Amino acid sequence: MMLTSNSATEWWKMFQESIAKELSNTPSQRLWEAWGSRGRRTIFYTEDLLPPVARELGLEWETELLAVDYAMSLPISRVPLVFVEAENDIGNAYNEVRKLCCLSAPVRVLLTVGEWDATEGVWSHGGLRLTLLKTWQAIVEAHVKARPSASVLGVLVGEWCDALPARSDHRLRFYSYLIDANAALSTDQTEVLFERIIPSAGLI
């Protein structure tokens, strides 16, 4: 389902009609209680009013979906041009990708860490690159199909290897990828953005 300006207006009409219906079906006592305090009103929205609206629209109900870790904005106007989500648990980074896809800044960035290198012998499981990169790309593709956007998703993956094959030094890498506005993985860039071999000797 692709959203256009017309279909977005239709969604708004359905949303407001459902809100009106739920409010009409709410007893006066419950409305009075909800307006007793800010906290009660928030509970009313969260528990009574909005979940039934989501169900009627055939949508999944979620709370506190968007809270962005970092933003880089234009001076004065403070319009964000870059949003960054940092996730230390790479297995849960799909949530950050979903969140970033909901934002309209030109550049959205996932910054995460994990056992990434697919080179044989580096990681016993063979590295997470192929699996997770495809997963994140599929999330972007689903969003593009529903709501085309000119924004891109940058992916930065930090990787620390404690012991490389045949040596005891440490290696820190950052891998970089770009998933473009059509959800295609760009090949016009260097995969390894940064690499440093760090000798074990001298580290405290």
Locations of the language-model features?
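Conserved catalytic cores of phosphodiester-cleaving nucleases, focusing on short active-site segments
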Residues: 70-72, 78-88, 100
